[in-house]
Regions:
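A structural detector for beta-sheet-dominated domains
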Residues: 27-29, 58, 73-75, 130-134
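Ser/Thr- (and often Asn-) enriched beta-sheet segments in non-cytosolic proteins
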Residues: 21-25, 65, 71, 126-132
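Structured domain cores in non-transmembrane regions
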Residues: 1-52, 56-57
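An exposed acidic His-Trp-rich patch
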Residues: 44-94
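Activation corresponds to long, low-complexity, non-globular regions
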Residues: 78-140
Length: 140
């Protein structure tokens, strides 16, 4: 397990803005899958993550490499009724305390299936997720 909470070039955990990045390193073997999560901060309970299966880190025994953003989905956790992104009074940083929004149905679902009347950005306009295999000593 790895945590990515310290921006590249920073000395301590912090949020990032446009153009900044987080990095983390993991060790994996064929058959390993990756799952990551990151909250869509200007929401009640939305988060980014791959599908339930995770992202396969190897294909035909070789590590994958490159942009995997297309495998990251915006999900609704189902814990609070959604308010308009970036405006709702029960969203960080405007909420007075954690968990102040009205309870929802508790069902996690892809935001594309949620009929709340709001528009959400495409994942690729919010983040880019890339995989870069480490160089193995002695490998060509």
């Amino acid at each position: 397990m790895a945590v990515f909470n310290t921006p590249v070039g920073a000395k301590s955990p912090a949020p990032i803005g446009p153009g900044a990045a987080y990095e983390c390193s993991i060790e994996a073997a064929p058959g390993s899958k990756l799952t990551i999560t990151s909250m869509f901060g200007q929401s009640n309970d939305l988060f980014y993550a791959p599908n339930e299966s995770g992202i396969a880190l190897f294909k035909d025994g070789k590590p994958i490499s490159g942009d995997i953003t297309s495998q990251i989905i915006l999900w609704d956790a189902g814990t609070e009724v959604n308010q308009e992104p970036g405006i709702g009074s029960d969203q960080a940083p405007r909420q007075k305390a954690p968990n102040t929004g009205k309870d929802e149905n508790g069902v996690v679902q892809n935001i594309k299936k949620v009929k709340d009347g709001f528009k959400y950005p495409k994942t690729a306009s919010v983040m880019k997720v890339t995989i870069t295999p480490a160089k193995t000593p002695g490998a060509n």
